[in-house]
A protein has these predicted regions:
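Class I S-adenosyl-L-methionine-dependent methyltransferase catalytic core
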Residues: 1-168
Length: 168
């Protein structure tokens, strides 16, 4: 993948393999990997789930898939084209899109910037849609700058993060 417009950073296969068990998948779950890249998360998914994928650099845009999925598991690029065609932060775009389509959960790899992306108004949207951050797994990836986290959001279970809706 020579084009790095979207700030593509390949997920180490071992990391994907070690993170998948944190996701409470059950037999028959429909799972999409919307930013497949070279397939680290997709290939690490257990055989008992139904898998689908998208990859913008292979002309299979995640927004062109219309099915609903139980789980979304991915390492999104740092930026994607927004509705105006300008490159923008992809983490909120991922959550905004899939919190209306995923039935059980969303798990994604992101850096510390993802916390800044969760503004009070965006946290309110997640709460209105019934989503909670249920787990954050800290990851050390030496070849990447900064600290990385595997965020797991679910409709079921209890969240560990809350917000103050007022800006001070």
């Amino acid at each position: 993948m020579a084009d790095n417009t979207y700030l593509f950073h390949q997920t180490p296969k071992e990391l994907a393999r070690d993170l998948i068990p944190f996701v409470p998948l059950v037999e028959g779950d429909r799972v999409i990997e919307p930013f497949k890249g070279e397939g680290a998360f997709y290939d690490a998914l257990p055989a008992f789930v139904q898998k689908d994928w998208a990859e913008i650099q292979q002309d299979r845009d995640y927004q062109s898939l219309t099915a609903d999925y139980d789980w979304v598991i991915t390492n999104p690029p740092f930026r994607l084209p927004n509705s105006k065609g300008k490159l923008a932060n992809s983490f909120w775009m991922l959550l905004e899109y899939y919190t209306t389509r995923a039935k059980k959960g969303i798990a994604f790899l992101g850096n510390d910037y993802c916390f800044s992306t969760l503004t009070p108004s965006r946290q309110a949207i997640l709460k209105e849609r019934g989503w909670k951050i249920t787990k954050v797994v800290v990851c050390a990836v030496k070849k990447w700058r900064g600290r990385y986290f595997f965020f797991i959001l679910q409709k079921e279970g209890s969240g560990f993060m809350d917000y103050l809706p007022t800006n001070y």
